[in-house]
Curated annotation (Swiss-Prot):
Residues that coordinate or bind ATP: 65-72
Pathway: One-carbon metabolism; tetrahydrofolate interconversion
Parts forming coiled coils: none
Gene: fhs
Keywords: ATP-binding, Ligase, Nucleotide-binding, One-carbon metabolism
Annotated protein name in UniProt: Formate--tetrahydrofolate ligase
Reactions the enzyme catalyzes: (6S)-5,6,7,8-tetrahydrofolate + formate + ATP = (6R)-10-formyltetrahydrofolate + ADP + phosphate
Length: 556
């Protein structure tokens, strides 16, 4: 089997102008970035914004192994298969962050014969969205520090600045830094730090904004610091929301590319799902819904993180609600949840599949709480055995959830036909009756308790002293009615990454909150979740290169 990049480079790409004709996008609707990439103009977005939306399919997964379970690959393969069976389909995905690409992932544009192309460009600088978000974020930092240097008319307490700088790399050395050193001409010394770009609130804002005006309003509502009297300082107080919007005026437009099979793909925005809401942009998803009969999208990590946030945070901003949710599972991950060591996952172990099924079962039950029908997709691997597959199908039958084996990595669209047909059957039965887990009127404590007890399976929530004080403060500021975005390990339902399967009776500890008032949610921090990742001992970057003719090597 060829590597992902070898497969990608063997495909003869069609001009993007030709690819998008099938969904009614013309040449004048595009802002081209070469022959194979484009941004969609606001003229076209506005032209279709009142059209009736098509069907929406959300792809999520069980709690993943460190290698991931193939959500993006399955999403792409499903979209290709839907097109192959005659359903006009688009896909809406997140764009990858360069940090993890250079770190552990090596690439994030699908895999095998289910990829979005050109994968080298998408994984590297693409159309410059990450650069624009990084620049806007750091422009805010520079303007904030300049305000303090020039007299601090707003009375900002430099000890209580909560806005950090960002860079689109994994760089642990930048987590805690001191700025303003070198004497009075260089600013006022203070502690600062860097997050990875995809953790920036500006990334979340870009992905939730519905147009330029909404983007500007959300940017204005960002809290950057507190005054000496402990009242919040917003971007609007600095009067710089216009400048930040200007920097992002092109980045807000969705990017168009194609799959190996020529399915039009909107790839736009990329917040992490463990420290942010983990979904691609509202603009991309909404536009796809109005251009196609079926839209396939994904939410990051497992359904306890990405799908919950998609349904509680993103869906209220969409023109329609999901018609079906596809939960991707792999037998290797189920065996890991069943107690098998990572080194032994390739060995047949039917009992471990049965034991690990508790994880998948809870995810199915959780999605049903939102009133949406579920389909399980088994992402097929070479080491899977007939006995293990039969056991999983039997277990799914017992809880009355349809299940299909999919081999889109190896077989592309053909490997997803059975899954596509099952999804269409579920969608066209029209059983979806979406409801949020909590209401806006619930307090922050109530929202978190519902997520912990009903989604995670936990017993209760423990709020540390700082979090308790913040709850009182946030209520005074009127922030207590915002949705909650849980920052939690992706590997477990709990806040302990080693507690696999479907644990019960545990507590979730909230150590502090981070207000993301521009994005419109409050982040609750649990465990040791990092907003600036580090690199592994042997980063993927060590195997990357470029040939004399400019061909990328080592992306996978």
């Amino acid at each position: 089997m060829k590597t992902d990049i070898e497969i990608a480079q063997s495909v003869e790409l069609k001009p993007i102008t030709e690819v998008v004709e099938k969904v009614g996008i013309g040449f004048d609707d595009l802002e081209l970035y070469g022959k194979y990439k484009a941004k969609l103009s606001f003229d076209k977005i506005n032209e279709v914004k009142d059209d009736k939306p098509g069907k929406l399919i959300l792809v999520t997964a069980i709690n993943p192994t460190p290698a991931g379970e193939g959500k993006s690959t399955m999403s792409i393969g499903l979209a290709d298969a839907l097109n192959k069976i005659g359903k006009k389909t688009m896909i809406a995905l997140r764009e990858p962050s360069l940090g993890p690409v250079m770190g552990i992932k090596g690439g994030a544009a699908g895999g095998g014969y289910a990829q979005v192309l050109p994968m080298e460009d998408i994984n590297l600088h693409f159309t410059g969205d990450m650069h624009a978000i990084t620049t806007a974020n750091n422009a805010l930092s520079a303007l904030l520090d300049n305000h303090i240097h020039q007299g601090n008319a707003l009375g900002i307490d430099q000890r209580r600045i909560i806005w950090k700088r960002v860079v689109d790399l994994n760089d642990r050395a930048l987590r805690h830094v001191t700025v303003g050193l070198g004497g009075p001409l260089n600013g006022i010394p203070r502690e600062d730090g860097f997050d990875i770009t995809v953790a920036s609130e500006i990334m979340a804002i870009l992905c939730l904004a519905t147009d330029i005006n909404d983007l500007k309003e959300r940017l204005a509502n960002i809290v950057v610091a507190y005054r000496y009297d402990r009242t919040p300082v917003y971007v609007r107080d600095l009067e710089i929301e216009g400048a930040l919007t200007l920097i992002l005026k092109d980045a807000i437009k969705p990017n168009l590319v194609q799959t190996i099979y020529g399915t039009p793909a909107l790839v736009h925005g990329g917040p992490f799902a463990n420290i942010a809401h983990g979904c691609n942009s509202v603009l991309a998803t909404s536009t796809a819904l109005r251009l196609a009969d079926y839209t396939v999208t994904e939410a990051g990590f497992g359904a306890d993180l990405g799908a919950e946030k998609f349904l509680d945070i993103k869906t209220p901003n969409l023109p329609t609600t999901p018609d079906a949710v596809v939960i991707v599972a792999t037998l290797r991950a189920l065996k890991m949840h069943g107690g098998v060591a990572k080194t032994d996952l390739s060995e047949e172990n039917v009992q471990a599949v049965r034991d690990g099924f508790s994880n998948l079962k809870r995810h199915v039950e959780n999605i049903r709480k939102f009133g949406i029908p579920v389909v399980v997709a088994i992402n097929e691997f070479v080491a899977d055995t007939e006995a293990e597959i039969a056991a999983l199908k039997e277990l799914c039958s017992e809880i009355k959830v349809p299940v299909e084996l999919a081999s889109v990595w190896a077989n592309g669209a053909d490997g997803g036909i059975d899954l596509a047909n099952t999804v269409v059957d579920v969608v066209e039965n029209g059983n979806a009756d979406y409801k949020r887990l909590y209401s806006d009127d619930d307090s922050l404590e109530e929202k978190i308790t519902k997520i912990v007890t009903e989604i995670y399976g936990g017993k209760s929530v423990v709020f540390e002293k700082k979090a308790k004080n913040q709850l009182k403060q946030f209520a005074e500021f009127g922030w207590d009615k915002l949705p909650v975005c849980m920052a939690k390990t992706q590997y477990s339902f709990s806040d302990n990454q080693f507690l696999l399967g479907a644990p019960e009776g545990f507590d979730i500890t909230i150590r502090e909150f981070v207000p993301k008032t521009g994005a419109g949610f409050i982040v609750a921090l649990t465990g040791d979740v990092m907003t600036m990742p580090g690199l592994p001992k042997a980063p993927a970057a060590l195997k990357m290169d470029v040939t004399e003719d400019g061909t990328a090597v080592g992306l996978f």
